Design a protein with these regions (language model features):
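Post-His helix in hydrolase/transferase enzymes
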Residues: 277-289
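Conserved loop-alpha-helix segment in the C-terminal half of the alpha/beta-hydrolase fold
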Residues: 229-271
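Conserved hydrolase catalytic core segment
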Residues: 96-141
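Conserved alpha/beta-hydrolase catalytic His-Asp/Glu region
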Residues: 158-217
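Alpha/beta-hydrolase fold catalytic core
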Residues: 1-32, 54-57, 94-96, 130, ...
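Catalytic histidine-centered segment of alpha/beta-hydrolase-like enzymes
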Residues: 268-280
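Active-site loop/oxyanion-hole signature of alpha/beta-hydrolase fold enzymes
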Residues: 12-17, 54, 64-100, 136-142, ...
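Conserved HGGG/HGGXW glycine-rich cap/lid loop of the alpha/beta-hydrolase fold
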Residues: 22-69
Length: 296
């Protein structure tokens, strides 16, 4: 079930836009920044963030640029723009911060830690080590990738947002994609991830322009090189159940873990891509053990 309402909901002016943050706990305590994945928003951490705050942290969940209530994107240079947003937000909140990040947010947390090691104490990466190598940019043909992204961007900006008749219909759509999420969570994510539409229905808040440099703006070897720069402790949480988005498994998962200098892996049985929603108790146990090992 979705957990406690945030204690505070604020906006910060960051990197020439307005970033929505949701806060739990005492602002004088060490900061843990929660970063969601693509098409999601900060309220996906309504169960996990208050539990982390109860351990003596200031838990801050962010709506990434182009998602939730935060400012929109002006182009598709999503990855690095959002990483810069998170870096500036971390400095404002009181770096170094701990980071809990899911999916795309997990990859961005690693990019952030590799580029700005002074900003990050540790990372809990929830199924966010990147997509399979075969869908990344081909280093031998980057021009084709650029052209494909531009063609896709043109289609996106020409297409009006789809308006859904109800939250229930939006939850149904998410349920077809995120097949393991409970119904109450599908409704929760739809309620906080949508806004009234022009014809009395609902539209998703996430701006699809963010997808034009996905699944990754980087080639495979460049991604590994970035991860090798991460010096802070990293806990990677993955599920063992088939899901739409948990696409890195087996030997490839082990290779990516071994490539990060101070990483450790915990499998959470019976979960898929949304480990922290499907099994928050096991997620918290793994986090507490990790923080007990590496420090607050």
């Amino acid at each position: 079930m979705p957990g406690h309402q945030p204690d505070r909901a604020l906006f910060y002016d960051v990197n020439r836009t307005s970033i929505r943050v949701w806060q739990w706990g005492d602002p004088s305590q060490p900061v843990v920044l929660f970063i969601h994945g693509g098409f999601d928003h900060g309220r996906m951490f309504d169960e996990l963030a208050p539990r982390v705050a109860a351990l003596g942290y200031h838990a801050v969940a962010v709506d990434a640029r182009g998602h939730g209530d935060s400012g929109r994107l002006t182009s598709g240079t999503t990855w690095l723009t959002q990483v810069l947003d998170f870096a500036l937000l971390a400095r404002h909140l009181g770096a170094p911060v701990g980071i809990v990040a899911h999916s795309m947010g997990g990859g961005q947390a690693l990019t952030l830690a590799g580029a700005f090691p002074d900003l990050v104490r540790w990372i809990v990466n929830i199924d966010g080590l990147g997509p399979p190598a075969e869908v990344m940019v081909d280093p031998d043909d980057p021009a084709t990738a650029m052209n494909e992204n531009l063609e896709r961007a043109l289609r996106i900006v020409r297409r009006p947002p789809r308006e859904w008749e109800s939250l229930e219909a939006m939850a149904d759509q998410r349920g077809r994609i995120n097949v393991r999420l409970p119904r109450e969570w599908l409704l929760h994510l739809a309620a906080h991830g949508s806004a009234p539409g022009p014809s009395g229905g609902r539209v998703w808040k996430s701006d699809p322009i963010f997808t034009i440099d996905l699944p990754s703006p980087f080639g495979y070897e460049q991604l590994l090189a970035q991860h090798r720069r991460v010096t802070c402790p990293v806990l990677v949480l993955t599920g063992d159940e088939p899901d739409t988005w948990n696409e890195v498994h087996g030997d490839e998962l082990q290779r990516r873990i071994a490539n990060i200098p101070d990483a450790r892996l915990v499998h959470v049985p019976g979960t898929g891509h949304y480990v922290h929603i499907e099994d928050p108790d096991s997620t918290m146990r793994a986090m507490e053990a990790f923080v007990g090992e590496v420090g607050p």
